[in-house]
Regions:
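Catalytic-site neighborhood detector that most strongly recognizes the C-terminal catalytic loop/helix
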Residues: 170-174, 272-300
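Basic, Lys/Arg- and aromatic-enriched nucleic-acid-binding interface segment
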Residues: 95, 107-114, 118-149
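Active-site/catalytic core of tyrosine-dependent DNA strand-transfer enzymes
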Residues: 182-235
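A short, glycine-centered helix-capping/turn motif at helix boundaries
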Residues: 93, 131, 141-154, 254-259, ...
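Conserved tyrosine-mediated DNA breakage-rejoining catalytic core shared by Y-recombinases
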Residues: 145, 154-191
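Short, polar N-cap/turn motifs at the start of nucleic acid-interacting alpha helices
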Residues: 159-162, 257-284
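Short basic/aromatic active-site micro-motif
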Residues: 235-255
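N-terminal core-binding DNA-recognition domain of tyrosine recombinases/integrases
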Residues: 12-28, 34-112
Length: 300
């Protein structure tokens, strides 16, 4: 071990090694969280200490600070990054052992957007139709194709097969999933036909170039939608993801009027893209897609 490795130099060293072993998105997250940790160390005059002198107590105090100022989930994610970085330091003999590995995650309540009521959905669509038609089309890709917001951000003109009514969707693992485009959406995107195949469907000014990180794209559309939410006094429990939950719930309940539960699952998996039955069932439970009929007579 080299006693001359300061906290800052050791953290920078570990980050540099991680740069080529994780995805760009993950590395950006690592860099952001480690910069917060470095600021914490500097504010307490710990930055020039040897990395081996940073204690479990120091790290716990930092994590407690993250928890107080954000959420259990953010605290746990920060812990995971620190654990990965300190594991790299241990593997490269900059520290004797990884003290972060002894720190446990804390229980975090699942954060899931609520579904919209029919009245809320109607009000949102009406307002977007009047004020922001590009945002409305963005939302319709989430609603009618059951895409995640970041998947909509990735869509380019070349991903649309107008003749076959098909859509190529790039998942986070870079694999391409093919989905059908329902007729009610296909009719609305005919204006895109013939445009530069490399253009993105959604940029700040409509179809066009937009070469920034996809997380920043997603954040842009979330902030744009927040103006609609604020105008309708919708709280933080509602967001773009809520449309996916809302329309999958609608589809599930409509299918259940005709098919058995098993048949409904089979049809739904083809549409939503869930790869396993258990994943679909868990998702449907989480969004309360199926509710019981009135059971008042059972309580009499």
């Amino acid at each position: 071990m080299n006693d001359n490795n300061t906290a800052f130099s050791a953290l920078d060293f570990a980050l540099e090694l991680k740069k080529n072993s994780v995805s760009d998105k993950t590395f950006i997250d690592y860099k952001h969280r480690i910069s917060k940790f470095k600021k914490y160390l500097k504010d307490r005059y710990l930055n020039d200490l040897p990395i081996k002198n940073i204690t479990k107590k120091d790290i716990n105090e930092f994590l407690n600070n993250v928890l107080v100022n954000s959420s259990p989930r953010n605290r746990n994610n920060t812990l995971s990054v620190l654990n990965a970085i300190f594991s790299t330091l241990e593997e490269n003999d900059l520290i004797e052992y990884n003290i972060v590995s002894k720190i446990k995650k804390i229980q975090a309540k699942p954060e899931r957007n609520k579904t919209y009521t029919q009245t809320q959905q109607d009000e949102i669509f009406t307002l977007m139709e009047q004020e922001d038609k590009d945002l409305l089309l963005f939302v319709k890709f989430i609603s009618y194709n059951f895409l995640r917001p970041v998947e909509v951000c990735r869509l380019q003109v070349k991903d649309i097969d107008f003749e076959g009514a098909k859509l190529n969707v790039r998942a986070k693992n870079k694999l391409i999933k093919v989905k059908i485009i329902p007729e009610l959406l296909l009719q609305e995107i005919q204006f895109i036909k013939g445009q530069n195949p490399n253009y993105y469907l959604f940029s700040p000014n409509g179809v066009g170039e937009w070469n920034i990180e996809e997380n920043n794209k997603r954040d842009y559309w979330s902030k744009r939608f927040k103006k609609v939410k604020d105008a309708l006094n919708l709280g933080k429990d509602y967001g773009l993801y809520s449309f996916r939950h809302t329309f999958i719930t609608k589809l599930y309940r409509q299918l259940r009027t005709t098919y058995t539960q098993g048949e409904t699952y089979d049809r739904l998996m083809l549409i939503t893209g869930h790869t396993t039955l258990s994943a679909l069932q868990q998702y449907l439970r989480d969004i309360d897609a199926e509710l019981p009929e009135d059971y008042s007579h059972l309580l009499e």
